[in-house]
Amino acid sequence: AIGKVQKVDVQYYQGWINPIIHDKDKRSSTWRLDPTKAGISCCMGDIGTHAFNMVEYTTGLRVTSLLADLNYLYEDNQMDIDGNVLLRLQGGVKGVLRASQIATGEENGLKISVYGDRGGLTWEQENPNRLLVRSDDGALQVYTPGHSYNSALSLGGTKLPPGHPEGIFDAM
């Protein structure tokens, strides 16, 4: 549908650490910001790993090398809370991974776009029932679950008619 993969762009933005990070007492009492409890990484170890996995899973290509620029705000807490990563994947495909837990106002914004030589795909975790497909001719298509235009594999995983959010059936 999109042809040969040429570019991948994934971001995972949250804002939950923003009100905590500016208060020294809260900073020191939050386990995610404590390297003895959380390990050597905060943002990348927490959500960056999910974004990284999304790149490899979605494209089917392995990351072969990367260059990361990680950010912390206070000398007394050098856990990364934000970062940008340049990716090189198999076949020379380039990508960008951006993750932040100080993106003010963001909730759980995982988003991936994969661009090929004939089109592109975009999916957002906060709008999981929509897959955006762009093509060379400029047409934007929006795919949602439960429609006959979906593949047999997709239809086999859908329990309800179009318009029902996936997972609601299981939650009730």
Regions flagged by a language model, labelled:
Residues 5-8, 96-100, 123-124:
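Beta-strand scaffold of nucleotide-dependent catalytic cores
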Residues 49, 75, 98-106:
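Glycine-rich phosphate/pyrophosphate-binding beta-alpha loops
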